[in-house]
Amino acid sequence: MQGLGKAKGINIKAEEAYGTSPENVLRSAKEKQKLFKDKGTVQIYCLFDKDDCDDEKFKKVIQQCKKAGFADVISVPCYEYWLLLHFKRTNQPFRDARECCETFQSEYNKKFQTLYTVKQLKAKTDIFNDLKDNLDSAIANADSLELEENNCPYTNMHSIIGKLLKYKIRN
């Protein structure tokens, strides 16, 4: 996200949550909202991976997110599903996040002829640079799938990316 923001001249700041659980992401967003209250126009996006979170608990957190005025960006089972869409259109059901990550790892390594582990790919800070040439494909792949929030897989990451792409660089 930050790579795209930099390319478009938008200040995107990814903040660490107290953990990756949906509850912790929401709690962190509420605290950041207080910090940015008097800083002008700030839109807070909460990026959620469903991972192993209970369905009802996950739905409740998403409702609270919307009620607080945050934009929710959801990936089921995980963020790596969005990354996978840069390589292929798939609505293959995944048993869990690990299977999705391994599928992304395989596609990434095949494309770039590398031998990254899942852990190394998750830590990669310049992944936008690697995938930016496939961004339009990822958006088209996500748009073409029958994606519903309670499906696995699901992502609405392309909606935030589409908004960012509409911004013009301001001088």
Where would I find each of the regions flagged by the language model?
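C-terminal accessory helical subdomains adjacent to catalytic cores in phosphodiester-
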Residues: 2-16, 23, 30-45, 50-171
